[in-house]
Amino acid sequence: MPRVGIIMGSDSDLPVMKQAAEILEEFGIDYEITIVSAHRTPDRMFEYAKNAEERGIEVIIAGAGGAAHLPGMVASITHLPVIGVPVKTSTLNGLDSLFSIVQMPGGVPVATVAINNAKNAGILAASILGIKYPEIARKVKEYKERMKREVLEKAQRLEQIGYKEYLNQKE
């Protein structure tokens, strides 16, 4: 049974939203992924949000570009946590999406990550689930420890060989 619902306004958002799916897979978290357009399929959006909990969904990640109404509209229908992913557009580089998602009225919160950063949305969803599921919390902690080790190893390497050699080795 999926614990996370990943939805997007268009299939053009999939290259961004797959990052959330990939990180959830890394944590071993079940998810469903589909297209739900707030503007083109409003009835589908309403039914998706209304019935998500019955399907076992505990967190929804919603990505959208442009007017980006999907995350906010879904949050207005469900009491489940909604994480909004602003998708970069060719017009305003995703700023329109970011502002649309982040500027929600009081009482209808949407947690918002950086433009095109569905990976962080997946990590945030895992952190939320980790409150209830100790195994997921353990995996999130291990992930963050691994990131810490990687940074410390890179810092040590840079300090040992200097920036010129470090950059040469990265090329």
From Swiss-Prot:
It catalyses: 5-carboxyamino-1-(5-phospho-D-ribosyl)imidazole + H(+) = 5-amino-1-(5-phospho-D-ribosyl)imidazole-4-carboxylate. SUPFAM superfamilies: N5-CAIR mutase (phosphoribosylaminoimidazole carboxylase, PurE) (SSF52255). Pfam families: AIRC. GO terms for molecular function: 5-(carboxyamino)imidazole ribonucleotide mutase activity. Keywords: Isomerase, Purine biosynthesis. Its EC number is 5.4.99.18. InterPro entries: PurE_ClassI, PurE_dom, PurE_prokaryotes. Substrate binds at S10, D13, R40. Disulfide bonds: none annotated. One of its GO terms (biological process) is 'de novo' IMP biosynthetic process. It is an enzyme of class 5 (isomerase). Gene3D superfamilies: 3.40.50.1970. Pathway: Purine metabolism; IMP biosynthesis via de novo pathway; 5-amino-1-(5-phospho-D-ribosyl)imidazole-4-carboxylate from 5-amino-1-(5-phospho-D-ribosyl)imidazole (N5-CAIR route): step 2/2. HAMAP family: PurE_classI. Belongs to the AIR carboxylase family. Class I subfamily. Catalyzes the conversion of N5-carboxyaminoimidazole ribonucleotide (N5-CAIR) to 4-carboxy-5-aminoimidazole ribonucleotide (CAIR). This is N5-carboxyaminoimidazole ribonucleotide mutase. It comes from Thermotoga maritima (strain ATCC 43589 / DSM 3109 / JCM 10099 / NBRC 100826 / MSB8).
